[in-house]
Amino acid sequence: MATVDRWLLPDGIEEVLPPEAARIEIARRQVLDLFQSWGYELVVTPHIEYLESLLTGAGQDLDQRTFKVVDPQSGRLMGFRADFTPQVARIDAHTLRREGPSRLCYAGSVLHAQPRALSTSRSPIQLGAELYGDASPTSDVEVISLMLATLQLTDVPDVHMDLGHVGIYRGLARAANLSGDVEQQLFDALQRKAVDEVQTLTADLPKDLGNMLRALVELCGGREVLAEARVRLGRAPASVLAALDDLLAIADRLASRYPDLPLYFDLGELRGYHYHTGVVFAVFVPGEGQSIAQGGRYDDIGADFGRARPATGFSTDLKTLVTLGRAEVVLPAGGIWMPDSSDAALWQHVCQLRNEGQRVVQALPGQPLSAALEADCDRQLIQQDGRWQVLPLTH
């Protein structure tokens, strides 16, 4: 390897330098404090574990995004976490085993073998919150509200939200008795809004079902979409109508809480179709091609761990929030330069200053006073009249 190559990082892997690292860490603490104020408890999960545990309940997308290695001790395949949710689901289902609802949150680095999109990070700092044990739209509204509070805390401007419900397509596909291949092809066509393909794939279905599946391409827009859906999907199975009712209840509550939040509905949006079971949502901002925060309902994700529970949650990338947010993160200003001395009184004074939250930097042997500027110090400790005092730094 050439010397120059030793400085290179893999595509999508980045290091964070001061002061940006301090901004990210301060924001992380603030967001976790926000989660705690809503009743969410922090969990810390392993960076790496056996692959079958890591991917349990997850879809194919997560499998493709997971780095895999062989454990030299057991010979078993392991993976680096690419998403916290399967791990948190295991904690809820297998470890905590609470009877009532559980509110859990997390913050930490994840690693992606494949990026979410072109030029996106493969090592985001994922943070999120999850609510287990309640199947009502009230829980969905809670996690969406917490997501919006997180964006408000970091002052991300001009957000708008997309809402959908995978239960609508799933209920129609079941009623049509589609084969697995056709269901997947139709799913792909709906995501691309490929009208001609959708028409071809539904041509042989009963008239009502074909019309309703084709309608999903067009059922996107503002709140009026929900009223239109009640008409165009009026002959749908009961599960589809129940999904529409849930979506309407969530939309009503959000409109009441956030009257200025633009809401966009897309009933053909099937983000996380193989993973989510109900409402899905995502937040976008101008200039960003990908959602900056997303989530939805994923009931029974803990079934493979022996306990099926309703679940809903959201996640986002802390690095992205800090980059896009306008919130002023106040970094500790300046510092105090401590001379290289063995004086016990000086040490006691420095300990007191640090306990008070002051930043004190120790001078190393041979360092001139000018080094204090490089250490971002604006004051110094000087002994006067037999006492150590903090005075302005003299150049």
From Swiss-Prot:
What Gene3D superfamilies has UniProt attached to this entry? Bira Bifunctional Protein, Domain 2 (3.30.930.10)
Could you describe the subunit structure of this protein?
A: Heteromultimer composed of HisG and HisZ subunits.
Query: CDD domains annotated for this entry?
Result: HisRS-like_core
User: What's any one GO cellular component for it?
Assistant: cytoplasm
In the UniProt record, what gene is named as encoding this protein?
hisZ
As for what it does, the entry says: Required for the first step of histidine biosynthesis. May allow the feedback regulation of ATP phosphoribosyltransferase activity by histidine.
| Annotated localization | Cytoplasm
Q: Main localisation, per the record?
A: cytoplasm
| UniProt-recorded name of the protein | ATP phosphoribosyltransferase regulatory subunit
One GO BP annotation of this record: L-histidine biosynthetic process
User: Which NCBIfam families does the entry link to?
Assistant: hisZ_biosyn_reg (TIGR00443), PRK12292.1-1 (NF008935), PRK12292.1-4 (NF008937), PRK12421.1 (NF009086)
Q: Which family does it belong to?
A: Belongs to the class-II aminoacyl-tRNA synthetase family. HisZ subfamily.
